[in-house]
């Protein structure tokens, strides 16, 4: 636990460039809420093969907030990927879902880099999203 807190603290220090701490934390909280909203929209839409689109969209919206949003998107995406990979390894075998993880990571990086998340939009997804 101490190691995890140390890593989070170090990435936080490195993530703050010249902006004030207040704006960085505000952006981080808003970015986390963007990811949360994208997750719930994905669950609400319930459209097959839409996960990459919503991952890209959540990371895109978080990155638009600024450095704090990018930081939050990276941390949340990496922790989620780590936990998912850990559970896959324990319950389903070593390489189960590896292709999905790689394509999800690519979609998240695509969104964080500011590119259009509609690149991953599946056919049949309502315009509401």
Curated annotation (Swiss-Prot):
Pfam families: SAA. Keywords: Acute phase, HDL, Secreted, Signal. It is found in: Secreted. Residues 107-121 have a biased composition (Basic and acidic residues). The lineage of its organism: Eukaryota, Metazoa, Chordata, Craniata, Vertebrata. GO terms for cellular component: high-density lipoprotein particle. SMART domains: SAA. Major acute phase reactant. Residues 1-18 form the signal peptide. Residues 107-129 are annotated as: Disordered. Its main location: secreted. It comes from Bos taurus (Bovine). GO terms for biological process: acute-phase response. InterPro entries: Serum_amyloid_A, Synovial_Prolif_Regulator. Apolipoprotein of the HDL complex. This is Serum amyloid A-4 protein. Belongs to the SAA family.
């Amino acid at each position: 636990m101490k190691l995890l807190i140390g890593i989070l603290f170090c990435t936080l220090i490195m993530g703050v460039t010249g902006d004030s701490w207040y704006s960085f934390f505000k952006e981080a909280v808003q970015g986390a809420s963007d990811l949360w909203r994208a997750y719930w929209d994905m669950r609400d839409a319930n459209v097959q093969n839409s996960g990459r689109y919503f991952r890209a969209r959540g990371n895109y919206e978080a990155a638009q907030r600024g450095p704090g949003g990018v930081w939050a998107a990276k941390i949340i995406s990496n922790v989620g990927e780590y936990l998912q990979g850990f559970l896959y390894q324990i319950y389903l075998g070593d390489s189960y879902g590896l292709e999905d993880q790689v394509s999800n990571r690519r979609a998240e990086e695509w969104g964080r880099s500011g590119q259009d998340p509609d690149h991953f939009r599946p056919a049949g997804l309502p315009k509401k999203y």
